[in-house]
Amino acid sequence: MKLLLSLAFVLALSQVKADKPVWADEAANGEHQDAWKHLQKLVEENYDLIKATYKNDPVWGNDFTCVGTAAQNLNEDEKNVEAWFMFMNNADTVYQHTFEKATPDKMYGYNKENAITYQTEDGQVLTDVLAFSDDNCYVIYALGPDGSGAGYELWATDYTDVPASCLEKFNEYAAGLPVRDVYTSDCLPE
């Protein structure tokens, strides 16, 4: 198990160049990394977490599954939204939820906001970097509570029809990492 984790860690680091992932290039990729535009769209559309390269999260718990998100209360003046997440984990097979204040942020020396900082109801502060976004989907580079990379997430509005653009980017960025399905048909109520 330690060998597998060490290998995954080394492979994840191979994606990083001088503490900066290969996709963290504002000139080349900034058009698809606009965090404020993404948060505004989140108010209009619900998204499901389709795939992830990690399985434990400080908010969603261990072995999280069936994660979905939406947002409300768009505040243009303060530039934030109230994000709502629903999920299950190995501690409870009943849907749980959390509300978090989501604010656009800047990472990797960007001039434009390319990350989202979440403040949970219990005061945790977590940051996700928007590695890629397109119509109806996005790829997140989730940072752990200590700021180190936790892994990649693939989100889409329809888990049965993930746009090729996001699937290709996710597969490129997550190459060599263990990938698991998070939102599947098992998540739907019977």
From Swiss-Prot:
Residue sites binding histamine 2 per the record: Y118, W155
Disulfide bond entries: C66-C187, C137-C166
Gene Ontology MF, one: amine binding
Annotated histamine 1 binding sites: Y54, D57, W60, E100, E153
InterPro entries recorded: Calycin, Tick_his-bd
Entry-linked Pfam families: His_binding
Keywords tagged on the record: Disulfide bond, Pharmaceutical, Secreted, Signal
Primary location recorded for the protein, binned into one broad class: secreted
Record's GO cellular component terms: extracellular region
Quaternary structure and partners: Monomer.
Name this polypeptide is given: Female-specific histamine-binding protein 1
